[in-house]
């Protein structure tokens, strides 16, 4: 994850000037093509470096595994996003969920695959050409007040805790309602309990991160919708 954070921070800095002529098109090309390749390269370097540093002394006389075999031991999925006032980009490989509540309350899952993975099988960063499996959500925000009011990223342990996709959608809608009524502090206090309960149902780890639009922008969006 730290490798993603480093790349995402650099992308976020570059996105500050996305209104320069031609800049948005270059950023889109980088987000869809170069960023996934850079992410996989950084992850592979970190994984193989860890192998070299922590290889068991007892394995000293054993034949050296191929790089692909080493990477299988570190295989992982990833979902992450960059949010700026004028640009929203997200990347995903493997399982996990991105839910977006738009300014008008519509709920979208823009990175949901056309076909769900069977069982526990999923794409992973350890794949031979993993960058090809990275899904990208690209959404310029030409009107800051109409940007998404809530973005939720979570591991698949959360969505799997529900009997159907409708249950997950209802959870996100409920989260949005609670944030509106109680504020971030109130939800933050009870969220760990919700996630522990979800983990018990799914039998898998459950992690969630959310970004909530500042209240003054939400009010501006409501005023524009009414007008």
Give the ranges of each region predicted by the language model:
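PP2C/PPM-type serine/threonine phosphatase catalytic domain
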Residues: 1-227
């Amino acid at each position: 994850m730290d490798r993603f954070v480093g790349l995402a921070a650099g992308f976020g800095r570059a996105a500050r000037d996305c209104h320069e002529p031609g800049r948005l098109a270059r950023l889109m090309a980088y987000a869809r093509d170069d960023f996934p390749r850079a992410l996989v390269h950084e992850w592979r370097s970190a994984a193989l470096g860890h192998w070299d540093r922590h290889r068991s002394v007892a394995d000293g006389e054993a034949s050296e595994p191929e790089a692909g075999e080493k990477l299988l031991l570190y295989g992982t999925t990833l979902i992450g996003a960059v949010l700026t006032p004028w640009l929203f980009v997200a990347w995903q490989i493997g399982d996990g969920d991105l839910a977006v509540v738009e300014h008008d309350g519509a709920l979208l899952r823009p990175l949901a695959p056309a076909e769900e993975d069977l069982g526990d099988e999923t794409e992973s960063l350890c794949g031979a050409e993993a960058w090809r499996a990275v899904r990208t959500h690209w959404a310029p925000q030409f009107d800051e007040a109409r940007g998404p009011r809530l973005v939720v990223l979570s591991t698949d342990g959360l969505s799997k805790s529900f009997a159907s996709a409708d249950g997950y959608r209802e959870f996100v809608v409920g989260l949005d309602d609670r944030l509106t009524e109680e504020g971030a502090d109130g939800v933050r206090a009870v969220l760990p309990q919700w996630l522990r309960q979800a983990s018990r149902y799914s039998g898998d780890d459950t992690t969630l991160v959310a970004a909530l639009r500042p209240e003054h922008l939400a009010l501006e969006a409501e005023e524009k919708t009414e007008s």
